[in-house]
């Protein structure tokens, strides 16, 4: 219970940009349970959160260590892969960074398409309903495949995408709860 509380507090701090506080919460949670996974649809390990907040604080060696650990536990964790790519790009390994960023963008795009199609009659319809995230991913993938790669733009947009994916889970859950409450006539789950 304590670990979940720390992760929730860390997520809230991270979303509003209080990265040092978020990092402290995530590191404490990782000490308690280094295998902790947050989320249901978009599952993320605690080391992904540690790595993202280290990245946001500009501590790239610590970010890389945590993100490598996250990906060794779950190689399909696209947000961790995105931030590993950003970390590599920020530390001078742009070729490898670009590979990781591109792979993560393709993974996020596939994941969003899977969720929104497979679960379109349930929770999937609440994920990226305005195609904002998928449009940004498509634009970044087009930029990567062109010969006109703007690194600053790619980094800025990738950071936005990472944060936006984090927020999207909360937005989808809130919208689903609101609709369920409306469908129940404001009674929640009461008969």
Feature names for model-found ranges:
Residues 111-191:
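Terminal, low-structured helical/coil segments at or just beyond the last alpha-helical repeat
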Residues 30, 78, 86-113, 138-146:
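TPR/TPR-like (Sel1-like) alpha-helical repeat modules
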């Amino acid at each position: 219970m304590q670990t979940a509380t720390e992760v929730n507090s860390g997520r809230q701090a991270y979303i509003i940009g209080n990265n040092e506080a978020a990092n402290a919460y995530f590191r404490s949670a990782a000490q308690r349970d280094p295998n902790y996974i947050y989320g249901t649809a978009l599952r993320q390990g605690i080391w992904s959160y540690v790595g993202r907040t280290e990245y946001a604080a500009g501590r790239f060696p610590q970010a890389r260590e945590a993100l490598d650990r996250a990906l060794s536990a779950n190689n399909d964790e696209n947000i961790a892969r995105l931030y590993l790519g950003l970390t590599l790009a920020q530390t001078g390994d742009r070729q490898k960074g670009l590979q990781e960023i591109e792979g993560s963008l393709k993974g996020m795009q596939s994941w969003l398409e899977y969720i929104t199609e497979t679960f379109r009659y349930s929770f999937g319809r609440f994920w990226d309903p305005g195609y904002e995230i998928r449009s940004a991913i498509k634009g970044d993938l087009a930029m990567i495949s062109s010969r006109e790669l703007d690194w600053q733009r790619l980094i800025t947009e990738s950071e936005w995408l990472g944060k936006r994916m984090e927020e999207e889970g909360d937005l989808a859950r809130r919208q689903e709860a609101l609709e369920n409450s409306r469908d129940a006539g404001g009674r929640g789950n009461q008969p």
